[in-house]
């Protein structure tokens, strides 16, 4: 039994030592956490900064909620350009309007002029070894492109206001585009015969 008693004594000694070590470790961990929280409070509030009482209320609500508490400065509305939607107008009403009103309505930020006057290209080098058939085909192609450009240039200036108002109505715009394509195809067909 003496061997058995020594075995019990050594087991109890090991268990007591482990319990004491766990207790001391727990005390050190609690002490360390308390010290860490105290250091964080000292770092957030330095000696020069003392928060006001009304700041605590503002910090609890989000930034958009804080806007209500700020006194608004009077704003001069005249310094901003007013953005307004264009009123819906029919094309017939604009055609009846006098020309002075049309020029006031037309505010252009970019030129929509598609004339070939400003566009100068370098002339292509002519190949001298072209056959008569190739020359005839090229002349026919030049005639077709010339007829297309004369159609574009043949619009009278009065139709520009009407044409700009067509862009307000997409259905009319696509109808006009389709009609122009069909007339160009029929013109090309007539020239080919």
From Swiss-Prot:
<feature type="region of interest" description="Interaction with PIK3R1">
    <location>
        <begin position="80"/>
        <end position="83"/>
    </location>
</feature>
<keyword id="KW-0472">Membrane</keyword>
<keyword id="KW-1133">Transmembrane helix</keyword>
<feature type="transmembrane region" description="Helical; Signal-anchor for type III membrane protein">
    <location>
        <begin position="11"/>
        <end position="31"/>
    </location>
</feature>
<dbReference type="Pfam" id="PF15330">
    <property type="entry name" value="SIT"/>
</dbReference>
<keyword id="KW-0812">Transmembrane</keyword>
<keyword id="KW-1003">Cell membrane</keyword>
<feature type="modified residue" description="Phosphoserine">
    <location>
        <position position="46"/>
    </location>
</feature>
<keyword id="KW-0735">Signal-anchor</keyword>
<dbReference type="GO" id="GO:0050862">
    <property type="term" value="P:positive regulation of T cell receptor signaling pathway"/>
</dbReference>
<feature type="region of interest" description="Disordered">
    <location>
        <begin position="116"/>
        <end position="166"/>
    </location>
</feature>
<dbReference type="InterPro" id="IPR020399">
    <property type="entry name" value="T-cell_rcpt-assoc_TM_adapter-1"/>
</dbReference>
<feature type="compositionally biased region" description="Basic and acidic residues">
    <location>
        <begin position="129"/>
        <end position="145"/>
    </location>
</feature>
<comment type="subunit">
    <text>Homodimer; disulfide-linked. Interacts with CD3Z. When phosphorylated, interacts with PIK3R1.</text>
</comment>
<dbReference type="GO" id="GO:0042101">
    <property type="term" value="C:T cell receptor complex"/>
</dbReference>
<feature type="topological domain" description="Cytoplasmic">
    <location>
        <begin position="32"/>
        <end position="193"/>
    </location>
</feature>
<feature type="modified residue" description="Phosphotyrosine">
    <location>
        <position position="80"/>
    </location>
</feature>
<dbReference type="GO" id="GO:0002250">
    <property type="term" value="P:adaptive immune response"/>
</dbReference>
<feature type="topological domain" description="Extracellular">
    <location>
        <begin position="1"/>
        <end position="10"/>
    </location>
</feature>
<keyword id="KW-1064">Adaptive immunity</keyword>
<protein>
    <recommendedName>
        <fullName>T-cell receptor-associated transmembrane adapter 1</fullName>
    </recommendedName>
</protein>
<keyword id="KW-0597">Phosphoprotein</keyword>
<comment type="function">
    <text>Stabilizes the TCR (T-cell antigen receptor)/CD3 complex at the surface of T-cells.</text>
</comment>
<feature type="compositionally biased region" description="Basic residues">
    <location>
        <begin position="119"/>
        <end position="128"/>
    </location>
</feature>
<keyword id="KW-0391">Immunity</keyword>
<dbReference type="GO" id="GO:0001920">
    <property type="term" value="P:negative regulation of receptor recycling"/>
</dbReference>
<keyword id="KW-1015">Disulfide bond</keyword>
